[in-house]
């Protein structure tokens, strides 16, 4: 469905994210079925449940390609600009967290809606030793084949795809199994990216081709000659489509706490977009780089669609900044929420997801399951509203005017 919509939107020259349109369609169908034939809506949800669990289990993996090819993305960025981007990323995360959290608390005090139990959310199964051994076998065999026969699968990128994909998956599996104390410093995504980079470095050294060409094979951005990163990023569209099911499942919660959720998410999203543009101009960051990091708090799946609205944006930098924002949130969100005295699960969930999207959500919900439904809703809505705002020409022009 994602690919069909993408082709249709390209053919019609429509700039709006096709997956987001598909998400709205799925959500509408589920709502209509729930009103007219409730059993059909339940059957549809049950039918897609395995796919939703698959996405939930592997979601962080789909963010990794931008980190793996980061050495290529930052090559032409001056060191001074890199420092400014880091400042905006870290400071922006904290500011967005505060804005979303304080807005949620203020609205909660006004509406005084009592919390009720949310719909339980299924958890994916942990990785088994058999899976780790299977992927290890794929890595070893495909690595040797790629070394001996550089174009065994037609092109160098296709030939390198199996071992680069296997190294990425293995890194994620190993990282996911680390003790929670280690994960705070060495997040599974970092482990995952390092694993892929080490595999690329080893292949580049043994084949005498160097690291850069192998990283180029990892993410080619050419559909006819995909690399491992292209395969993983191909799941970003289905991730957006899956938002429809999570929002439908928590529809009663959304309806009950609509004031807190929608107000906080809209305010936080607008603040994130415009504050990034303003601070980028104040610190003298190049306009093309500022444009590239505007959707820093929005999930990669939609952040890439947002920067496609702007000319000259570096999409690889966009993805990297979004992932780094999520990693900052994953490592520090709980401590910062405690320091800010945010005790309400709704405020904690919304603040986390609005500032650090899926990675922050995963980190907080692992220890505070009561915040997970609000994280999941805010995570989806932040991306949706960010895309909707940036699809409006007047909003894009105002952002560009601020950037200069």
Question: How should these model regions be labeled?
Answer:
Residues 12, 37, 75, 81, ...:
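Membrane-interfacial segments
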Residues 218, 246-261, 278-286, 305-321, ...:
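Helix-loop-helix hairpins and the membrane-proximal interhelical loops
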Residues 1-71, 84-96, 121-248, 253-272, ...:
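Helical membrane-embedded segments and adjacent short helical loop/helix-boundary regions
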Residues 48-77, 117-130, 232-235, 289-328, ...:
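Alpha-helical membrane segments and immediately flanking helix-loop junctions
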């Amino acid at each position: 469905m994602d690919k069909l919509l993408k082709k249709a939107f390209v053919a019609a020259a429509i700039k709006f994210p096709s997956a987001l349109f598909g998400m709205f369609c799925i959500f509408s169908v589920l709502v209509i079925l729930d009103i007219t034939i409730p059993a059909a809506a339940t059957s549809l949800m049950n039918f897609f449940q395995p796919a939703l669990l698959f996405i939930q289990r592997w979601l962080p993996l789909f963010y990794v390609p931008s980190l793996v090819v980061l050495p290529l993305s930052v090559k032409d960025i001056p060191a001074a600009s890199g420092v400014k981007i880091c400042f905006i990323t870290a400071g922006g995360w904290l500011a967005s967290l505060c804005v979303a959290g304080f807005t949620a608390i203020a609205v909660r005090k006004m509406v005084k809606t009592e919390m009720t139990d949310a719909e339980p959310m299924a958890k994916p199964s942990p990785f088994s030793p058999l899976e780790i051994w299977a992927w290890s076998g794929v890595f070893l065999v495909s690595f040797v084949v790629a070394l001996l026969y550089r174009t065994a699968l037609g092109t160098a990128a296709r030939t390198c795809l199996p071992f680069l994909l296997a190294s990425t998956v293995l890194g994620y599996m190993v990282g996911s199994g680390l003790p929670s104390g280690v994960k705070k410093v060495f997040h599974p995504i970092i482990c995952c990216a390092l694993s892929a980079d080490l595999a690329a470095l080893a292949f580049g050294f043994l084949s005498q081709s160097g690291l850069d060409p192998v990283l180029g094979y990892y993410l080619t951005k050419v559909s006819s000659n995909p690399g491992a990163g292209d395969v993983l990023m191909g799941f970003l569209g289905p991730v957006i489509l899956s938002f429809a099911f999570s929002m439908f499942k928590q529809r009663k919660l959304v309806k009950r706490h609509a004031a807190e959720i929608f107000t906080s998410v809209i305010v936080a999203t607008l603040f994130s977009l415009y504050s990034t543009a303003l601070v980028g101009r104040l610190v003298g960051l190049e306009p093309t780089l500022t444009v590239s990091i505007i959707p820093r708090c929005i999930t990669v799946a939609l952040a890439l669609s947002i920067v496609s609205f702007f000319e000259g944006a570096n999409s690889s930098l966009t993805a990297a900044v979004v992932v780094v924002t999520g990693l900052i949130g994953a490592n520090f969100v709980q401590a910062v929420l405690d320091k800010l005295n945010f005790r309400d699960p709704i405020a904690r969930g919304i603040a986390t997801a609005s500032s650090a999207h899926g990675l922050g959500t995963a980190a907080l919900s692992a220890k505070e399951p009561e915040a997970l439904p609000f994280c999941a809703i805010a995570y989806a809505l932040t991306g949706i509203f960010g895309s909707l705002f940036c699809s409006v020409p007047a909003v894009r022009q105002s952002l560009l005017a601020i950037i200069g």
